[in-house]
Amino acid sequence: MINRSAGKDRDRSRSGDKELRINHKIKAREVRVIFDDGTQSVLPIEDAMRCARDAELDLVEVSPNVLPPVCKIIDYGKYKFHQGKRQKEQRKNQKIIKLKEVRMQPKIDTHDLDFKYRNILGFLKEGNKVKVTIRFRGRELAHTHLGYGILEGILERIGDANYILESPAKMEGKTMFLVIAPKSKK
């Protein structure tokens, strides 16, 4: 027989969704209890459980790594709901910046270069970083100045204050690249 539950527990711990200990699952003998009105006191676990039971709420261990562990007397279902709502709001407000790559060769035609330039501008307007890469093959490596010229031309055409050069043009093996990023709106 295969034990399938071990994998599920491992996946849950990896996702960062740690379960808080509540009521009888709290293992400490003594806890610091924060009441609804904000007052604190250090109580034996039995007294803290009794206070929670009298208020018809749950005793939730919110900070287990301190001595004594910090517990709150709250409605656990309501607490989980608000935690989920807060995390959803944080994910919604988070902006993911992607790195887009535009590749070309040193012997690129002007029309093709114009097309690549429009792609670069489009990526920057979307808020993404752009890595402009020029690949050299064979004897083209003897003419790296052509690559620098192309990259300089792109930077001159962009020349807008809304974009910054994050990484200047440099050679790495047979490729030359630079990274352009949009300025952050603060």
Swiss-Prot record:
One of its GO terms (cellular component) is membrane. Residues 1-20 are annotated as: Disordered. Keywords: Cytoplasm, Initiation factor, Protein biosynthesis. Signal peptide: none annotated. Belongs to the IF-3 family. GO terms for biological process: ribosome disassembly. SUPFAM superfamilies: Translation initiation factor IF3, C-terminal domain, Translation initiation factor IF3, N-terminal domain. It comes from Borrelia hermsii (strain HS1 / DAH). This is Translation initiation factor IF-3. Monomer. GO terms for molecular function: ribosome binding; translation initiation factor activity. Pfam families: IF3_C, IF3_N. It comes from the Bacteria.
